[in-house]
Structures are given as structure tokens and as C-alpha cells.
């Protein structure tokens, strides 16, 4: 799993070489998913990530992905997803239609990593091999419940320039 997490970090900061994977971090709460996502946000920088959830990959909301290298949907619900075609296209590096609110409509190939965290993997109508081969499901099995929270991890360490450069 550690090697896979390093590969995900590489994909987040080098999105032009897409591996065609949609990353889903799974596991019960308080296990490090959010901390890992915060580290990635700090690695790519403030203006380079978006925060859409899978059910928002449609309509005007797609415009918020333009120019980003990473999308992180944190703590997504286990709701049924009737439509995942835009997610599949973005993951593969294929063109999608961007419809700017009060603006133009155009086709664009987005180069970004889509990552979501969830307690359970969301269900979808799509049961094709094309959907399943794009999924990269990473289990987070740690359990930090009952342990004293080290607030410095998120407030200091994950923002430390030297640490981020090392990563």
C-alpha cells in the first residue's frame, strides 16, 4: 500500500502522464485518509486543486476543474451514482464538454487526478469493465480512535516547505 500511495503522490504532481486511474481511499473514520489528502493539497498548492464530489461531475460545476492538477472529494456519501461518464472520460484523459456559466461551451481534455475518500465505495449504474479498470481502491485500515490527536501533523508538519520538498 505504501508504494501505491507514493505512486498516487507522483500522479498528483505529474498529471500529464495519466495512468487512467480514479483513486478512492476507503476505511472507517479517523484513519489518515484526510491527512493524506491534506498533504496532497499542500503539495500541489492552493490554486491547483478542486473539491468536487462524484455527483458534481456534470453541468457548470465541471468548469471548476479547468487548470487543476488534482480533484479531491473528501468524505463522499455512499449514494448511488447514476452517471459516471464524465468521471471516466476525465480519468482516461478524454475530452469532455465544459459549459461555463454565462460563458462559452467547449471541449477540453483535462489532465488531473481524481481522488475521493469514503467510508464505503459508492455504487453506480455502470457495471462495465471500463468503470472497474479505472478504479484504484486504497484501503486505510489504521484506527487512531482513542489515541491523543497530534494537531501538529496537520497544522505544522504538512505545511512545512522542507518536508513537502522532500516528498
Predicted region positions:
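Segments of Walker-type
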Residues: 1-3, 47-51, 65-66, 109, ...
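Conserved catalytic/switch belt of AAA+ P-loop NTPases
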Residues: 13-14, 41-45, 84-106
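Alpha-helical scaffold elements adjacent to nucleotide-binding pockets in ATP/GTP-utilizing enzyme cores
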Residues: 36-39, 68, 82-90, 97, ...
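Conserved AAA+/SF3 P-loop NTPase catalytic/coupling segment centered on the Walker-B
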Residues: 69-92, 106-110, 124-131
Amino acid at each position: 500500500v505504501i508504494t501505491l500511495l507514493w505512486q498516487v503522490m507522483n500522479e498528483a504532481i505529474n498529471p500529464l502522464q495519466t495512468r487512467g486511474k480514479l483513486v478512492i481511499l476507503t476505511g472507517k473514520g479517523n484513519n489518515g485518509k484526510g491527512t493524506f489528502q491534506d498533504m496532497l493539497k499542500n503539495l500541489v498548492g492552493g490554486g491547483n486543486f478542486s473539491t468536487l464530489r462524484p455527483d458534481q461531475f456534470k453541468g457548470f460545476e465541471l468548469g471548476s476543474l479547468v487548470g487543476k492538477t488534482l480533484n479531491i472529494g473528501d468524505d463522499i456519501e455512499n449514494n448511488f451514482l447514476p452517471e459516471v461518464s464524465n468521471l471516466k472520460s476525465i480519468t482516461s484523459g478524454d475530452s469532455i464538454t465544459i459549459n461555463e456559466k454565462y460563458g462559452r461551451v467547449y471541449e477540453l481534455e483535462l489532465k488531473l487526478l481524481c481522488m475521493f475518500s469514503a467510508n464505503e465505495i459508492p455504487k453506480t449504474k455502470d457495471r462495465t469493465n471500463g468503470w472497474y479498470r479505472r478504479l484504484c481502491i486504497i484501503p486505510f485500515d489504521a484506527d487512531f480512535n482513542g489515541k491523543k490527536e497530534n494537531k501538529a501533523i496537520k497544522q505544522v508538519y504538512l505545511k512545512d516547505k522542507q518536508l513537502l520538498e522532500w516528498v
